[in-house]
Amino acid sequence: MKTKRLMKFVMAAACGAIMAGAVHAETAEVTLARQFGIGYLPLTVMNVNGLVQKHLKQSGLNDTKVTWSRFGSGSAANDALLSGKLDFAAGGTGPAIILWDKTRNNAKVHGVAALSSMPNLLVSAAPEIKSLKDFTDKDKIAMAGAGSSVQTVYLQMAVAKEWGMDNYKKMNPHMVNLPHPEGLNAMLSGATGIRSTFTTPPFQYIALEKPGVHVVLNSYDVMGGANTFLMVWATDKFRTENPTTFKAVLGALNEATEWINANPRKAAELYVKDTGGKDSVEEIEKMIRDPQIHYTLAPERILPYAQFMNDVGTIKNRPQAWSDLFFPEIHDLKGS
């Protein structure tokens, strides 16, 4: 998705900063989060291709150190963000919306931009489990950030449709908190009693290549179509105190996103190299080209997702528009 107006805004701000000179000192180091999976591909491209450094230098910030940190879940990134150890968190929409709600009167966390929309699949290696109704008390579901993750909310929304809003937590006792790679391995090994996992690309596609593994639930079916799975968020304090750095990171994210959409093969090669070469370039390229997978800064169907969280009491504040959840820099995009 082209975002020319956004880039004009970012570049104008960068040029203004250079012309005005160092109006005030900005942070000497910017720290960004990474996680596992191709949903985070824009961040991987930013890291490998040095795009944050590029946009910082274009903005006149030549000496800012760029540090990347990996986290196993969005909730872990939230802890680091609030403690001041992280400037830009990344993860599922669930943890981001929860922090937006909790920090309305202090840190004022908002979304910077969406990262990707992609279906999340609840898959199972148990032949008798074909729907949510087939889970017994002994059947466990591995998922990253269980209890607060995006997969948690997808599952709760599906449960509410099946058994009513009053029972939306019916499946919570089945959740086991494991990062996506470990959750996949646990299900495939069968040694831990975990026979299902609610996960993301590429892990769900790897799982489906194994005999007997099948889809139980698709998040797009729950949401009625494509919706934002991953996003980037930050505190208002960081944005206010470091406006040039903030816009440089957003500009880098936009460049990475447009590069992926224009160069899916090169993006697949970059991802495979960065992750150690275990995945097939052809398979990763196929995922990137999948019409169900969108790399875009514009949020998709995030409002009904957040409003469900308010309906069940997960968050206290109810957003009236998708833009309530994000900083103004992307308000001109066609979000939903």
Report the location of each language-model feature:
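Short, glycine-/small- and polar/acidic-enriched structural segments
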Residues: 26-168, 174-177, 195-201, 225-226
